[in-house]
Structures are given as structure tokens and as C-alpha cells.
Amino acid sequence: MKGGNIVTNWHLLHFFDQQQPRKATVLRQILTNKRTGSVLFWGLRYHYLDYLNAVPRLDVKKFDDVIDELLAQKWLHSSTRGLQLTSQGQKVLATHQTAYSFTDHPELNQKFDYQLWQAILLLMVQVASEYRYHNSNYYVANQNLKAQFLIKSWLQVNSFETLATEISECLAQFLDQCDPAKADLFTAKLVGHTQNGLSDGQIASQLEISPLEVSWTWRDLALQLAAFIRARSNLKIGQLVQITALPGALTPTIRQTAMLFNEGKTVDQIIQMRRLRRSTIEEHLQVLAISQPDFPYEKILSESDLETLTKVYAETAIDQWQYAELQQQGIEMPFLKFRLYAIMKTHGEYNE
């Protein structure tokens, strides 16, 4: 994903559907980790939420240019409701995709700072390898100063032997459970005493895939390795992984709203206690409902509300619901209730 470019000329087709129109702006905002209530709602509707923060440095112009190209190729079709995958586009996907085309665990981009973790990982492997060969005079392949500082600080408390033993054992165990071809791709990029890591381009040439697919696959495996190490609490190198951990989907301010809401406070009480705008608190509750399938909707949606909303929207697909429909029928209801009902019904669809 160097330079924030996540696609060749067809990879974005993966995010579109033949039945459901989807807006490219939502995909772009999801990839760059925009977390407004509206973006997250449509991300939920489009099954995009696992891809939050997948490309934080996305080149927006290149993204837009690729969308235009896919439309020009007639692999996507545009309507007022969004973009849909065409039958031609589906054939392109089926023909071109390989085992390296898409990540297996995109959700891990939300759990770890990839740029920092990648630098730490590459340095750990190199330092461990040189230690095994009793070599203390070598050129450090990765120039990330923060990663260098963190590893030096860690080694002031822990031994080189611990580093070498733990990282070698973890790599062996982790790669043993991976697809062999992907494991080979991953190790080809590592730097050691007698091994100069290959570039994405060199690996791509060997495997006859695109450099992007090499980058994407390596990133996916690196993040999986971070999760693998963190799950083993006895490992000292887990401290280095933990440094790269991201705070998660819920910001501290949303967590504070959640705490008050779970204590039984009403929306009005939370607004008064937190001295925040109603729109802010209501957005917090939308984000909570999106991220928590067991959200207690009954605290906000009464039986009467549910009856009204069901009557108005029963015959319409969720993607086509309009808040204005309530007003047109002379029904006064806060937008929060309308949106929470849509979120509740969406989670219900996915659990059927």
C-alpha cells in the first residue's frame, strides 16, 4: 500500500455488489478511518466496517481516478443511488483475483499501528539474526528512528537472547499455520545476517503478481503476527507489540457517554451532565449501536415508536429509507430514533 495506492485497475471491484448500490465516498471514508455516525452506518450497510483504517494515507485523486476508470470500462454502473458491480465486472474479478489479491484479516488495521509495527518487526528480526551470528557491526536496514529507540529501550531491560529466542519461535509457529506460499512471501522480505530482504517488486516478479498484492499480503500477515504475539501473554516481545496497539473503535468521549447510558441516564441527562450538543451525544449513541449488536434499543425506542416505524418502512428496503418520509406523514420523531431503528434492523438482517 505504498503511497496510499490500494488498487491496480480492478481491485476496488471487490468492494461493490451486483445487487446493492454503494457510494464510493463511503468506501473512501471507511478506508481512511473516518468515523462519523453517517459513515459508520453506511459502512455497516455495505459490509465495509472491517476495512476501517485499511489505507489511512489513501491518495484520494488516485482513488477517484480508478473509480472513473472502472466506470469507463463498464465494470461498474452508476445510478443516483450509488455504484453497482456489472456482470462484466464480476467476470473481471473472477478472472483476475488470486490468493494474494485481498486480505484475510482487514479488521486488524484497526488494532495496530501498521507503520510502527512493521518497522519494529523488521528490526527485531534483523537484530535477532545478527545476535545469533555474534555480529554487532552491521547496517540497520530499517531507518525508523522511533522503532530503533523502542527496541534499544526494550533491550536495556531484556536480553538479546530473549529477543532472539522469542521472535524465532513465534515466527516458526506463526508461519507454520499460514498458507505455505504466503509464508514464503512473508519471509522473503525479512532482513537477516546473510539475507537481504527482497523488495515488493522483486517478490512480485517471482510470483507473477502485482507489487501491490505483495504489499497487501505482507501487511496482512504482519498484522496477524502482531495479534498472534499479543495473544501469548508470557512473551516479553509482546511489550513491543502492545506499544503499537490502537485505542479501538470507541474514543474516550464515546466511552464516557456509553458509561452514563449504561448507568440508565437518559439522552437529556447525558447532554446536561457532559455539556455537549445533542447532535454529539446522539452520534455517540449511533456509533455504540453500530459497534454493539446487543445495544439496548428499548432504552430509546418505545413500543409505540417501533409500531410507527414498522408501519412507515415495512415495505421499503433499508437502503432506501428516508427520514423525510416520517415528516411527510405528519409524524414527529427525532432522527436518532429513525437511525437506531435502521441499525437495529440491519443487525437483525445479518443475524438471520
Predicted regions and their residues:
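Exposed, interaction-prone assembly regions rather than primary DNA-binding/catalytic cores
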Residues: S101-D176
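A short, conserved structural fragment
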Residues: D68-R81, A227-F228, D294, T346-E352
